[in-house]
Amino acid sequence: MRIALRLGAIAAACLWAAACARPSISDVGDAKTGAALIGQAQCGACHAIPGIAAADGLSGPPLKGFAQRSIIAGMLANTPSNLVAWLRDPQKIVPGNAMPDTHLSDAQAQDVAAYLYTLR
């Protein structure tokens, strides 16, 4: 019983540490390209996004301070791999959510993620 409790505590600590780790922007993609893609995909129709012209949407969460968030999509640790997966196919991650299919390639999603990680 004690071993199970300790293992559970260790697992919880590892998940917490992973969620709190902040990725290096250079490890994700190109932030400048990501900003352009965000504009093209009209993400600002739903989200308020600092640094993106006319990105003042109110139906999605505002993305100011995105890099400081520990959780994305209400349930995922804020890691580059989780963010890229979410950007590529949000319905696969959380079926029925309001985020539309972005039609981003893996490389494009990495670039968008790089931009989002500049938002502190």
What are these regions (language model features)?
Residues 1-20:
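Sec-dependent bacterial lipoprotein signal peptides
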Residues 20-39:
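Electrostatic cytochrome c docking/interface patches
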Residues 21-25, 46-53, 68, 88:
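Detector for the c-type heme attachment site
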Residues 30, 42, 79, 83, ...:
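Stable alpha-helical elements in mature extracytoplasmic
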Residues 31, 35-37, 50-84:
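Gly/Gly-Pro-rich "capping" loops immediately C-terminal to redox-active cysteine motifs
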Residues 45, 57-66, 86-116:
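Axial heme c-ligation environment in periplasmic c-type cytochrome domains
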Residues 119-120:
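Short, solvent-exposed mixed-charge patches
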